[in-house]
Amino acid sequence: MIMRMTLTLFVLVVMTAASASGDALTEAKRIPYCGQTGAECYSWCIKQDLSKDWCCDFVKTIARLPPAHICSQ
C-alpha cells in the first residue's frame, strides 16, 4: 500500500514538472524578447527561478544559441 502511494506521488510530481516546463516553453515563444537572442532568452528563463542547466537546455530547445560563457561549463 505504501509503495502504491509512493508511486502515485512520484507520477504526480513528474507530471507537474513536465507541465511546468511545457508552460515555460509556451510562454517563452509568446514573449518577443525571448525570441530575439539566446542571451535574452536565457536571462528571461533565469528570472523564472529555473536552474542554469535547465535554462541552457531550454534556450537550445527553441533553436537559439545560449550564452557560451555560462552554458559551456
Curated annotation (Swiss-Prot):
* Compartment(s): Secreted
Where is this protein primarily located? secreted
Q: GO molecular function of the protein, one example?
A: toxin activity
What tissue specificity is annotated for this entry?
Expressed by the venom duct.
Signal peptide stretch: 1-22
UniProt keywords (A-Z) are: Cleavage on pair of basic residues, Disulfide bond, Neurotoxin, Secreted, Signal, Toxin
Disulfide bonds, which pairs?
34-41, 45-55, 56-71
Instruction: List the GO terms this entry assigns under cellular component, sorted alphabetically.
Output: extracellular region
- Tell me, in a sentence or two, what this protein's role is: Neurotoxin that induces excitatory symptoms in mice following intracranial administration. No symptoms are observed after intraperitoneal and intravenous (tail vein) injections.
Similarity comment: Belongs to the conotoxin K superfamily.
Recite the other comments. Negative results: does not affect (up to 50 uM) the Nav1.7/SCN9A channel, Drosophila Shaker channel and rat KCa1.1/KCNMA1 channel expressed in HEK293 cell, as well as on whole cell current of neurons from neonatal rat hippocampus and prefrontal cortex. In addition, no detectable effect is observed on either action potential amplitude and duration or Na(+) and Ca(2+) current amplitude and kinetics when im23a is tested on action potentials and depolarization-activated Na(+) and Ca(2+) currents in rat DRG neurons.
Domain comment (free text): The cysteine framework is XXIII (C-C-C-CC-C).
Return the protein name.
Answer: Conotoxin im23b
